[in-house]
């Protein structure tokens, strides 16, 4: 199994990099992890809606270039479905049993995701209505992926 995480923008915070590296290492015994950062677009301070759409479209093109044609794609979006960890774990297992070898997770930039990327997605999930920095969401997501594997293993990690 392959887990691909496509994100917009470069992660700069060392504490987040360290956490992501730790969980990636833990996941490695279950799946190959690929972390892909695509460049973000600079957003003018008082950008119009049209400018924001153009920015998301450019970022969306970069994301689309990294999605494999046979990937199962899960986007993180505020309007996505909220899942308990156990359900998320079961979904990951079901995806694999359905014949997909790569699950691709996508976290957009500060403006969100281009509509074309959302339409390409097989599933949209949300971690709640709170607004969190997209850099922090990388760590939260990778921890939940690790937790999903631990649930599948019946590990006491998830209590």
From Swiss-Prot:
GO CC annotations, alphabetized: cytoplasm
Binding residue positions for S-adenosyl-L-methionine: 76, 108, 127-132
Entry keywords, A to Z: Cytoplasm, Methyltransferase, rRNA processing, S-adenosyl-L-methionine, Transferase
Entry's localization field: Cytoplasm
Enzyme class: transferase
Predominant localisation class: cytoplasm
Pfam families for the chain: SPOUT_MTase
Domain of life: Bacteria
Keyword Metal-binding: no
Keyword Repressor: no
GO molecular-function terms, A-Z: rRNA (pseudouridine-N3-)-methyltransferase activity
Catalytic activity: pseudouridine(1915) in 23S rRNA + S-adenosyl-L-methionine = N(3)-methylpseudouridine(1915) in 23S rRNA + S-adenosyl-L-homocysteine + H(+)
The enzyme's E.C. designation: 2.1.1.177
InterPro entries: Alpha/beta_knot_MTases, RlmH-like, tRNA_m1G_MTases_N
Function: Specifically methylates the pseudouridine at position 1915 (m3Psi1915) in 23S rRNA.
Family of the protein in this entry: Belongs to the RNA methyltransferase RlmH family.
Family matches, as HAMAP family: 23SrRNA_methyltr_H
Subunit structure: Homodimer.
Name recorded for this polypeptide: Ribosomal RNA large subunit methyltransferase H
